Amino acid sequence: MPLAKDPLHPSPEEEKRKHKKKRLVQSPNSYFMDVKCPGCYKITTVFSHAQTVVLCVGCSTVLCQPTGGKARLTEGCSFRRKQH
């Protein structure tokens, strides 16, 4: 009787939804990102799960607010995920 799912070759979407410790290869859910300020266009590096309010170095506007998990970016801010 064949299995319905292949445990050694899960789909990428299925792997993303799993807990970080239960994936085939363990990997964290958090990352660093470059956030661009909508006012002065300066780029600040922010942790995705920041636990404090992050302010822009140039104009002191709020870039992101902490929530229970991931930090919520302020409207108008653009970000890009940093590479390893």
Curated annotation (Swiss-Prot):
<comment type="similarity">
    <text>Belongs to the eukaryotic ribosomal protein eS27 family.</text>
</comment>
<keyword id="KW-0862">Zinc</keyword>
<keyword id="KW-0689">Ribosomal protein</keyword>
<dbReference type="InterPro" id="IPR000592">
    <property type="entry name" value="Ribosomal_eS27"/>
</dbReference>
<dbReference type="InterPro" id="IPR011332">
    <property type="entry name" value="Ribosomal_zn-bd"/>
</dbReference>
<feature type="modified residue" description="Phosphoserine">
    <location>
        <position position="11"/>
    </location>
</feature>
<keyword id="KW-0963">Cytoplasm</keyword>
<dbReference type="GO" id="GO:0006412">
    <property type="term" value="P:translation"/>
</dbReference>
<dbReference type="GO" id="GO:0005730">
    <property type="term" value="C:nucleolus"/>
</dbReference>
<dbReference type="GO" id="GO:0006364">
    <property type="term" value="P:rRNA processing"/>
</dbReference>
<keyword id="KW-0539">Nucleus</keyword>
<feature type="region of interest" description="Disordered">
    <location>
        <begin position="1"/>
        <end position="25"/>
    </location>
</feature>
<keyword id="KW-0479">Metal-binding</keyword>
<dbReference type="GO" id="GO:0042274">
    <property type="term" value="P:ribosomal small subunit biogenesis"/>
</dbReference>
<dbReference type="GO" id="GO:0003735">
    <property type="term" value="F:structural constituent of ribosome"/>
</dbReference>
<comment type="function">
    <text>Component of the small ribosomal subunit. The ribosome is a large ribonucleoprotein complex responsible for the synthesis of proteins in the cell. Required for proper rRNA processing and maturation of 18S rRNAs. Part of the small subunit (SSU) processome, first precursor of the small eukaryotic ribosomal subunit.</text>
</comment>
<keyword id="KW-0597">Phosphoprotein</keyword>
<dbReference type="Pfam" id="PF01667">
    <property type="entry name" value="Ribosomal_S27e"/>
</dbReference>
<feature type="zinc finger region" description="C4-type">
    <location>
        <begin position="38"/>
        <end position="60"/>
    </location>
</feature>
<protein>
    <recommendedName>
        <fullName>Small ribosomal subunit protein eS27</fullName>
    </recommendedName>
</protein>
<comment type="subunit">
    <text>Component of the small ribosomal subunit. Part of the small subunit (SSU) processome, composed of more than 70 proteins and the RNA chaperone small nucleolar RNA (snoRNA) U3.</text>
</comment>
<dbReference type="InterPro" id="IPR023407">
    <property type="entry name" value="Ribosomal_eS27_Zn-bd_dom_sf"/>
</dbReference>
<dbReference type="GO" id="GO:0032040">
    <property type="term" value="C:small-subunit processome"/>
</dbReference>
<dbReference type="GO" id="GO:0005737">
    <property type="term" value="C:cytoplasm"/>
</dbReference>
<dbReference type="GO" id="GO:0008270">
    <property type="term" value="F:zinc ion binding"/>
</dbReference>
<keyword id="KW-0687">Ribonucleoprotein</keyword>
<dbReference type="GO" id="GO:0005840">
    <property type="term" value="C:ribosome"/>
</dbReference>
<feature type="compositionally biased region" description="Basic and acidic residues">
    <location>
        <begin position="1"/>
        <end position="16"/>
    </location>
</feature>
<keyword id="KW-0863">Zinc-finger</keyword>
